[in-house]
Amino acid sequence: MSKKKKIILCCLAALVVVAAVAAVIVYSKLPHALNYPIDKIEPCAHQTVSVVSQDTDTVTLQKNDDGAFRILMFTDQHLNGDNKTGYKTVDRMVEAIQREQPDLVLVGGDNITSGMNRKRSAQFAEIFEQLGVYWGGVLGNHEGDNKYSITRTEMVGIFSSHAHCVMLPGPADIDGDCNYVIRLLDKDGNLVKTIFCLDTFDEISDETAASLTLYDKRTPYDGAHENQVQWYREKAEALKETDGNYESILLIHIPLHAYDEAIESEAFLYGDKREDICSTVYDNGLFDAIQDVGVTQIVFCGHDHLNNFGVQNKGVLLSYIEPSGYGAYGMDRRGAPESEWLQGYTRLDLLPDGVIAQDQIRYAEVFGD
């Protein structure tokens, strides 16, 4: 080999080394982890529930003491790696959980967003391990939508590998992740409430859109697919055989079109509509299934960060979870002072007589922001 070629090869090798080092440095500086002292989190005062059974699509939790079954719901936290907003989002959630001492936490999707999020996903689950609180929920439209993100299936796998996560992938023969049921029992083993969780994906493709009759919407948001709706019907009916005339809650991320229909004729029971409802753009039959089966009292969703209302539609309460994250658009984009921001959580107390006491709580009201 000539001296000239050796020099060229040495230069190329040096460039490769420099590029590799630069890539490592850049990667290390990118915001792919939660900058929060998770190991310093103080656990909740006592463990209030335990898992008594679990199979492919159903997990049962039993309360170990008397009193209402308390659930806290958070949604659209958008933990995208931004250190400042991520820290505040996690800190507020942790403070709320320690303050409220819930039996169960549910998340409504868009929890871990953006790319390079494997570590953030594990850290998110570790928060609940430190707190000693069981948690579950669904994914939103932004989990897995970044080309540098782990897949939705991988994320659910990371979550569910932790002891306090009751999130299940669900049946392998239907579409999506997080299609499952949580049954809640009181101290004596009586059923308190059943929670159905369904994946609503992100956006439909142009090809799929061309094959459907769409509502007049700007963004073609997806929803539960036909085989998921059929699973809901069959599972809900099957549970009547074991649980009798039970009542349930449905948790999804993208709202049903039934929300749009309801606000045309019904007054809000609480909250307000501050932006368009970005609901599923086609009729997937889920609300019809809810009507036909007759066990679901309330549907909770996330997705729209400026909506926090509840409204009745054909005897079913359609509600938003109070938006929780500081890492995405909110009232700040409209120039509102922080005292008017909506970030917070939804609290449910499932009372022994079957009544659900619900509160939409803003962090600004609790922590004085």
Q: What do the predicted segments below correspond to?
A:
Residues 1-18:
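N-terminal Sec-pathway targeting helices
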Residues 80-83, 113-116, 137-149, 203-206, ...:
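Active-site environment of divalent metal-dependent phosphoester hydrolases
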Residues 34-59, 123-243, 343-351:
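Extended active-site neighborhood of metal-dependent phosphoesterases/phosphodiesterases
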Residues 30-123:
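N-terminal active-site segment of His-dependent metallophosphoesterases
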Residues 84-87, 109-127, 144-164, 262, ...:
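Metal-dependent catalytic neighborhoods of phosphoester/phosphodiester hydrolases
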Residues 25-51, 59, 181-189, 286-293, ...:
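Binuclear metal-dependent phosphoesterase catalytic core
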Residues 101-103, 194-197, 211-305:
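His/acidic metal-ligating clusters that form di-metal
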Residues 42-48, 72-90, 112-119, 146, ...:
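Acidic/histidine-rich helix-loop elements
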